[in-house]
Amino acid sequence: SQGAKPGLGGQLMAKKVTQELADIRGIPAGIDLRSPSRHPDILGADDLVIKVEELREATGYKLPVSVKLGAGRVRDDIKIAVKDGFDFIELDGMQGSTGAGSAEVIDYVGIPTLAAIIEAEEALAEIGRRQDTQIVLMGGIRDGIDAVKALCLGADAVAFGTSAIIAGGCIACMQCHVGQCVTG
């Protein structure tokens, strides 16, 4: 779940589901693609441990397994992620740019990105796991200044999602969810 719309799934409008995308996802082209807000086979923390192990097996134990948390219940979620054995945690704050969420959700749900890293740091300190847990912060990291702030507050790395899609042609008109973006 993205930090800009925690707890919600995603939807890609039918006209954006090209044949190439359909082949990759194993779905028919030209129909709405809806992604659930959660994995249907993960009902609790115990199921999450099993999923981590399944992913490790699928990659031959050669790749790290991470979890992306939409910043909401940061303290609790960080502790669960550490207990369940993820190699690193991606923490996504509410300030990420998404056109796939409603204005109400984007404006009023979630926790600001930099505040999220502070809560994560405190949660890791409470359980004595800060030294062996890597956190990648994302969601509203727009430039080098934001990245430096995040690193100074405790993030081990930052990720730039919006910058990458803008470099790819997105004009940030925030109309993804209604299919009216002029760039497609």
Residue ranges and their predicted role:
Residues 1-30:
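Flexible glycine-/small-residue-enriched beta->alpha junction loops
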Residues 2-5, 27-48:
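Active-site beta->alpha loop and helix N-cap motifs at the rims of alpha/beta catalytic domains
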Residues 39-184:
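Glycine-rich phosphate/ribose-binding loops and adjacent secondary-structure elements
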